[in-house]
Amino acid sequence: MEANIVKEEIKKILIESLNLQISPDEIKGEDLLNEFGINSVDAISIFISIENTFDIFIEDEDLSAALISSLDSITNFIMDKNNR
C-alpha cells in the first residue's frame, strides 16, 4: 500500500473517531494532538480503527502520544508494520 493512500485512510479514521465535521483535505496533520485536542479515549478509538482498517496489531509498547502526533508518524508506523 502506498503512503498517500495510507494517509487518506488515516484522515478518514480521524474524522470518524473524533466526530469531526470537516473534509479530509482540511486535516493538516503536522500536530494532531493540538490540532484536535486528542485525549486518551480518542487515542484508543483511533488505535483500534487503525488496527481494524490496516489489519495490524499495535503492541502495548507502541501505544504513545508520539505515535499519533502527526499523519507522518502514523503513516510510517503502518508502512513499517505492513513491510514486516
Regions found by a protein language model. Name each.
Residues 2-38, 48, 52-84:
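Phosphopantetheine-dependent thiolation modules in NRPS/PKS and related acyl-activating systems
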Residues 44:
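Conserved catalytic core of two-component sensor histidine kinases
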